[in-house]
Amino acid sequence: MAERGIRISYESIRLWCIKFGPKYARRLRRRHNGCGDTFFIDEVFVKIQGRQHYLWRAVDQDGDVVGVLLQRRRDGKAAKRFFKQLLRASSSEPRRIVTDKLRSYGVAHRELVPDSIHDTSQYANYRAELSHQPTRVRERGMRRFKSTHQAQRFLSTHAAVYNLFNLGRHLISAQHYRVFRARSLALAYNVPLRLGIVRWPNKSRIYRKLHEPRS
């Protein structure tokens, strides 16, 4: 925008994120290649408006976020609700599920995915625990979330963008990383164009008006 001489306020960007963020995230999820067959699941405390909430998050063996859900409880009913979201997001049932020893996970596992391996061994769930760190950083930067709806919208949208650029830099060469990053950037720019969020102004009336001779 700045390169085109367009001045935008912070409030405009915030309103655009509210309006177009969920649509943008849905488009990215459709383009995603799918998740792995091992889910690492964990929940953390999040305080919103003085009330305690639980942020449930699941990542696969590649570090991609499979699902994020904010709930008031962490009982068996809440666990089953989160597991159902994960099954809708993935193309098939996971081969292995790694959690801590919270009993709610056992309830959801027995009723929804009994054929999957349920691993509750110590230190096995470190990947899910580490995935909460970026959320804590953003939570401090935003001076805590203002509402559950805002938190759910922000975290779901950010997860879709994170998956797009989670390329596994430590596993590939610099040449391949540049190629994959270029593809991710092209997709990131292409999705807003398809949604009508961004319209390149080369042929817009503004540009035509600027080039019209003055009378």
Task: Give, region by region, the residue ranges found by the protein language model.
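Mobile genetic element proteins and their domesticated derivatives, centered on retroelements
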Residues: 13, 42, 58, 63, ...
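C-terminal domain-tail junction helix/linker
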Residues: 141-143, 152-215
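A short, conserved beta-strand element enriched in hydrophobic/aromatic residues
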Residues: 55-74
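Short, basic alpha-helical nucleic acid-contact segments in DNA-binding proteins
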Residues: 6-8, 15-37
